[in-house]
């Protein structure tokens, strides 16, 4: 069949992404030659995360085309969250459509979604990634492909700006990332949702429309719809009407540029963190050390050995860095210790570094606090600062 321009674009995007995760290096030599070749049963495996929607069905179909041409197996993993009536049927129909396209293995997993304060959307996302990672490890997949499009990227930027600030909010979703030891990639970030819809039409692929997207709703979506659906249905179109141009492409390109900045800042802050921060899990040695050097909070400082992770931040080392790097080092170190601090709390710790005048410590979540003594800032759970 003759490929449409959008289908050729998608094929190129998937092939480029597989190159980015070094999958082209595993291509069987015979597949570089013309002719018909069968994919070996023990060939490397790529999985596509598939919901049955237009984006993921388009990605599944295109990935199968590309992987088959490379001698790589292409399967799918379908996660049933069990949050909607009939979700089992939707998952089953998606599985049958993927089998009809020739994908294999077709893996269907049931997720348990438990919202514990972070909201249902976040809990469902965490449960989904847990199942995707488990499926990848159990099947030995080299990578899992996600079907996020340029439209999803624009929505992510707006959601990021609503929920946070700075370059991280603008950076959107990375094309390639690792989670729990599993490589994930997003080949379709350069394609629009209209293009994935067209690809399904080109290939005769049926798909399911999630009713929570609100596509069939006239007027603004009620507040009980997912935030992403409301951004997609209401906010983006309103901004586009106001701006008078394609803001989806504009936001997606802004995300690409911001991500380059973010990756450099992250790399630099990681280098500084390696020199300025010491992290030790409990229990740790309570041997005395100099207060001028970073060290972990010792188990001997508290009666509870379950206090978690202690941090020691060298003031002399971190003070030499620009504010952008200092704040990232502090934020990354706290995150590594399992402390989800606010921007105001991170800034207060930074003042212990650059504006030290004997002020008290900074209270943090989970019973942690940050206190400066001489040239070291200690981040420990309450009680662990005693006698130090």
From Swiss-Prot:
Keyword Glycoprotein attributed: no
Annotated gene: tilS
Comment, domains: The N-terminal region contains the highly conserved SGGXDS motif, predicted to be a P-loop motif involved in ATP binding.
InterPro entries assigned to the protein according to its UniProt record, in alphabetical order: Rossmann-like_a/b/a_fold (IPR014729), TilS/TtcA_N (IPR011063), tRNA_Ile_lys_synt (IPR012094), tRNA_Ile_lys_synt_N (IPR012795), tRNA_Ile_lys_synt_subst-bd (IPR015262)
Gene Ontology CC entries for this record: cytoplasm
Name of the featured protein: tRNA(Ile)-lysidine synthase
Keyword tRNA processing: yes
GO molecular function, one term: tRNA(Ile)-lysidine synthase activity
